[in-house]
Amino acid sequence: MRITIKRWGNSAGMVIPNIVMKELNLQPGQSVEAQVSNNQLILTPISRRYSLDELLAQCDMNAAELSEQDVWGKSTPAGDEIW
C-alpha cells in the first residue's frame, strides 16, 4: 500500500487509510511510538492507561463475592497446568 507524505506547515504528515486504522484498532488522536529501523519507519500503537476510577466504573459492585474455596475448587485448567 502506498501512502503519500504531504507538507503540513513546517512539518510533514501522511494520512492513514481507514482500512488500516480498523485493522490496527487505532482511533483518531491516539498516540503511536515511532522508530526507524533498517531504513523503515515503524509505528507502534501505545496502549491506553486506564485510571483506577475508570477501572472501578466497569466493576459490578453488587456482584456476589465468592469464597476462595469456591474459586479454586471449581476452577478448570486455563492452559497446560495439571490439576
Swiss-Prot record:
One of its GO terms (biological process) is regulation of growth. GO terms for cellular component: toxin-antitoxin complex. Keywords: DNA-binding, Repressor, Toxin-antitoxin system, Transcription, Transcription regulation. Induction: Part of the chpS-chpB operon. Disruption phenotype: No visible phenotype. It holds the Pfam family MazE_antitoxin. Residues 3-48 form the SpoVT-AbrB domain. PROSITE patterns: SPOVT_ABRB. Signal peptide: none annotated. One of its GO terms (molecular function) is DNA binding. Disulfide bonds: none annotated. Belongs to the PemI family. NCBIfam families: PRK11347.1. Antitoxin component of a type II toxin-antitoxin (TA) system. May be involved in the regulation of cell growth. It acts as a suppressor of the endoribonuclease (inhibitory function) of ChpB protein. Both ChpS and ChpB probably bind to the promoter region of the chpS-chpB operon to autoregulate their synthesis. Interacts with ChpB, inhibiting its endoribonuclease activity. This is Antitoxin ChpS. It comes from Escherichia coli (strain K12).
